């Protein structure tokens, strides 16, 4: 067996931040190492894996051997190596304390294993992992199971001559699952009747019948019989909803195709196009909507066969971003800050509760009095056994709160319920660990029900809080029960639906009392789901008919990932219609209120975005950003000076409260009211 040697090199804080702030939150799963194990780790200079590349099939479990060596090439006994899986493998963190670990293929594609050695904590802390240094990588390829069949989709419109339609289908594996990487090639039996491109764009050329064949690289085929019909359209009329608009505002067209007798032809796919007469950033979509990223005059064209129509739309600029003013900073330079919740206590005072992450030890929830937002006052803290207190939520009546626990020294994680009779000095009312010992990453409170994200099972636990001092299990829901190739990160619920951020499985929508699919708060029913190639679905928040999904993607250049805008007006068929993509940073947690989206955007600080009206295209490029503030702490005012790492954002009584992982609590205020989109 070929052996592959990789020398360890020290990883910088920025690169380690990319690794450790991913949604698997590996810091929460860190083992406890003895002083002897950490001392042994100081001797390690090399790792030798028993392969040059790890290749594994989806759902297959393999054993990976690895040996640690010192500078003289001698094996090192007693040290602990941490193996982080980036892309396609489970578990996300393995502890190499023996000769091998077991890994399971999860998501087909390319990735890597990153190894770190545990050393004495006095040797330094690297972004949340005190006493961890010296990393190596091993390339990984996860293969899907062989393609076994193709399921062809119906065409969206009647295939008339002179029109083009997209053929589509799903490749299924020999295990009955959707193939994640296979592509389909297309061929027409008679290109004089209907031509089809290799990617499946079918164009009707003459009335008649053809067979369109779909095939995969391994020879799996499927056929569809297509009847092309003579195009009946002789005229088209189109009227824009408005002839003048702003960048980012969507214009809807009333487009009607008619036959020779003036009857509307409704089952035809018209060709839509846009050209810039004075601008170069206009887009027209299949549903007849238009939006522009740049100012200017645009000509929108609808055509089919010999018929066509056009309309001109004038586009002016939106008002640009305005100042976001710093109101106050509550610095924390001793421990990393996680999420926050701001509320009015039962004593009439306002409070912000902030959690803590592993760097600096975690173990605390801080209590800030923010009745005067210009002067946040740290009045108390709650100490629990947990290296990570990732989330904090407060009940609707502000009588109790929940904080989550991960990586407790006892391995008994779960949730802690706080009594808020005195919100300035909350006390522990109850703990719940049974069935939750793997750790709880996030929670959402809906009345007397708490939905909890279980790290150990990747399921959503349902907890009855009708008696907060005695929480009870009330149910559970998970995607693909019994399977391990999944990762649940967050849950948000409102108006009878729950929105689960299921990482590479995307957004999962459940009926938890809406009544549309027979679900109740304790017996959820599946409604629909939507995923996208990059995966890493980290957070979801619904506003009107849109769900805003945030990615969390670590790269060598820092955090990346953006906001996907999902149209759920038809809740059974969610579709992505827009995005907000800040190029130089990565999205984390979000808050939406009064059609304004607030995004804690890691190194991009907090971003404020107008999400009123109909949404299409790239909201960032359209100029919908209303303002931003970079949460950069001064020297001595945070764990890392002059470096934003925004974690969470919440609007409360006109002020925006932001938690920053490396600098604590910030209070800012936008200098103008929300603009109105007509």
Regions found by a protein language model. Name each.
Residues 24-27:
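Sec/Tat signal peptide C-region and signal peptidase I cleavage site
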Residues 29-321:
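Extracytoplasmic soluble-region selector
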Residues 2-13:
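Bacterial N-terminal signal peptides that target proteins for export
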């Amino acid at each position: 067996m070929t052996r592959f040697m990789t020398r360890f090199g020290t990883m910088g804080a920025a690169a380690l931040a990319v690794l450790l702030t991913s949604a698997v939150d590996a810091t929460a799963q860190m083992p406890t190492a003895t002083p002897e194990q950490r001392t042994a780790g100081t001797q390690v200079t090399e790792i030798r894996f028993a392969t040059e590349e790890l290749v594994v099939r989806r759902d297959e479990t393999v054993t990976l051997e690895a040996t640690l060596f010192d500078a003289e090439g001698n094996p090192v006994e007693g040290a602990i190596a941490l193996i982080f899986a980036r892309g396609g493998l489970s578990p996300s963190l393995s502890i190499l304390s023996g000769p091998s670990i077991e890994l399971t293929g999860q998501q087909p594609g390319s990735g890597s294993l990153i190894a770190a050695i545990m050393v004495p904590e006095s040797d330094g802390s690297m972004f949340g992992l005190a006493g961890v240094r010296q990393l190596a990588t091993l390339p990984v390829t996860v293969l899907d199971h062989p393609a076994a069949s193709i399921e062809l989709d119906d065409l969206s419109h009647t295939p008339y001559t002179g029109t083009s339609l997209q053929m589509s289908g799903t490749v299924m594996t020999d295990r009955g699952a959707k193939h994640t990487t296979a592509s389909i090639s297309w061929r027409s039996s008679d290109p004089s009747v209907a031509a089809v491109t290799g990617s499946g764009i079918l164009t009707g050329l003459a009335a008649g019948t053809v067979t369109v064949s779909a095939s995969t690289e391994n020879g799996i085929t499927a056929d569809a019989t297509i009847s092309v019909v003579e195009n009946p359209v002789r005229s088209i009329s189109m009227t824009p909803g408005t002839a003048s608009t702003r960048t980012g505002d969507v214009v809807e067209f009333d487009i009607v195709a008619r036959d020779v007798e003036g009857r509307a032809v409704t089952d035809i796919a018209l060709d839509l196009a846009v050209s810039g007469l004075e601008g170069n950033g206009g887009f027209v979509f299949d549903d007849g909507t238009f939006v522009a990223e740049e100012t200017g005059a645009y000509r929108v064209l609808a055509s089919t066969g010999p018929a066509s129509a056009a309309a001109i739309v004038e586009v002016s600029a939106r008002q640009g971003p305005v100042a976001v003013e710093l109101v106050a900073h509550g610095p924390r330079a001793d421990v990393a800050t996680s999420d926050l919740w701001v509320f009015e206590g039962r004593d009439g005072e306002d409070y912000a509760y902030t959690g803590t992450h592993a760097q600096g030890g975690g173990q605390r929830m801080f209590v800030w009095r923010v009745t005067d937002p210009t002067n946040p006052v740290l009045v108390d803290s709650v100490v629990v056994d947990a290296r990570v207190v990732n989330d904090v939520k407060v009940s609707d009546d502000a009588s109790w709160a929940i904080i989550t626990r991960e990586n407790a020294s006892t391995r008994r994680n779960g949730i802690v319920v706080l009594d808020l009779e005195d919100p300035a000095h909350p006390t522990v009312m109850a703990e719940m660990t049974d069935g939750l010992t793997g750790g709880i990453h996030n929670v959402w409170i809906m009345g007397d029900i708490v939905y909890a994200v279980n790290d150990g099972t990747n399921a959503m636990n349902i907890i009855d809080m009708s008696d907060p001092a005695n929480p009870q299990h009330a149910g559970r829901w998970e995607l693909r029960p019994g399977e391990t190739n999944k990762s649940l990160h967050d849950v948000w619920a409102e108006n009878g639906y729950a929105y689960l951020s299921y990482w590479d499985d995307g957004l999962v929508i459940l009926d938890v009392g809406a009544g549309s699919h027979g679900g109740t708060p304790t017996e959820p029913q599946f409604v629909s789901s939507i995923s996208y190639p990059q995966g890493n679905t980290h957070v979801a928040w619904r506003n009107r008919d849109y769900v805003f999904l945030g990615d969390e993607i670590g790269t060598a250049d820092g955090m990346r990932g953006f906001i996907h805008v999902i149209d759920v007006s038809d809740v059974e068929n969610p579709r992505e219609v827009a995005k907000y993509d800040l190029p130089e940073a990565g999205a984390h947690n979000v808050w939406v209120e009064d059609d304004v989206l607030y995004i804690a955007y890691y190194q991009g600080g907090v971003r404020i975005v107008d999400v009123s009206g109909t949404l299409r295209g790239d909201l960032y490029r359209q100029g919908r950003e209303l303002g931003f503030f970079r949460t950069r702490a001064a020297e001595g005012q945070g764990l890392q000076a002059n470096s934003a790492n925004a974690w969470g954002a919440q609007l409360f009584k006109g002020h925006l409260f932001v938690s920053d992982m490396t600098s604590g609590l910030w209070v800012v205020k936008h200098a103008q009211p929300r603009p109105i989109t007509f």
